[in-house]
């Protein structure tokens, strides 16, 4: 299973990369907005420059999302994003226009990530259009009392049934249990906030054991 980090923070990406477990990065307009919330002069050129900096840190897929809704505009913007770096994956929302853009990109060698996926039919359409990745948002489904992980299971089953090569990225991960469940149902990737990545390494019994080991080690003479 691959681990992506879901952030636009360069510091968080660097910290996660130092752990030796990072395979890629996903960003979106909301994550970008968090890091520039105090900036009044942030331009689209600044956005592209920031994405380029991310690509310099991680040797793996970096998802950068289009910020338009019409297919033609998505295509123009996506081609511009793809030109930033060979590892760029263009994120397109799973809409009718998004599907048109995904099909265009897949036909022209540009990798895509179908995002904002909330149903198995959306995921099936993404695979048929040639998306390289599909991102079901489990946390947001859980928020409305619907099983996000059941959606992931359905997508994995459908893709396995028909041999689709589209990789499933479990998105909107809120806690370590989401990561465990993603691995259990066979998702290819979980994209995880840095705060949750750190939680994956923690356990109270590990802390308790270390405390005891250090106490015992203290009695040894230099």
From Swiss-Prot:
Q: Name one GO molecular function term.
A: aldehyde-lyase activity
* Catalysed transformations (reactions): D-sedoheptulose 7-phosphate + D-glyceraldehyde 3-phosphate = D-erythrose 4-phosphate + beta-D-fructose 6-phosphate
Where is this protein chiefly located?
A: cytoplasm
- Taxonomically, the superkingdom here is Bacteria
Compartments annotated for it: namely: Cytoplasm
CDD domains xref list = Transaldolase_FSA
Which keywords does UniProt give here?
Answer: Cytoplasm, Pentose shunt, Schiff base, Transferase
Cellular component GO terms held in the UniProt record: cytoplasm
Q: Which InterPro entries match?
A: Aldolase_TIM, TAL/FSA, Transaldolase_3B, Transaldolase_3B/F6P_aldolase, Transaldolase_AS, TSA/FSA_arc/bac
- Gene Ontology biological process: carbohydrate metabolic process; pentose-phosphate shunt
EC number of the protein: 2.2.1.2
Which PROSITE patterns does this one have?
TRANSALDOLASE_1
Q: In which pathway does it act?
A: Carbohydrate degradation; pentose phosphate pathway; D-glyceraldehyde 3-phosphate and beta-D-fructose 6-phosphate from D-ribose 5-phosphate and D-xylulose 5-phosphate (non-oxidative stage): step 2/3
Question: Which residues catalyse the reaction?
Answer: 91 (schiff-base intermediate with substrate)
What's the stated role of this polypeptide?
Answer: Transaldolase is important for the balance of metabolites in the pentose-phosphate pathway.
Query: Which family, according to UniProt?
Result: Belongs to the transaldolase family. Type 3B subfamily.
Entry protein name:
Probable transaldolase
Source organism of the structure:
Chlorobaculum tepidum (strain ATCC 49652 / DSM 12025 / NBRC 103806 / TLS) (Chlorobium tepidum)
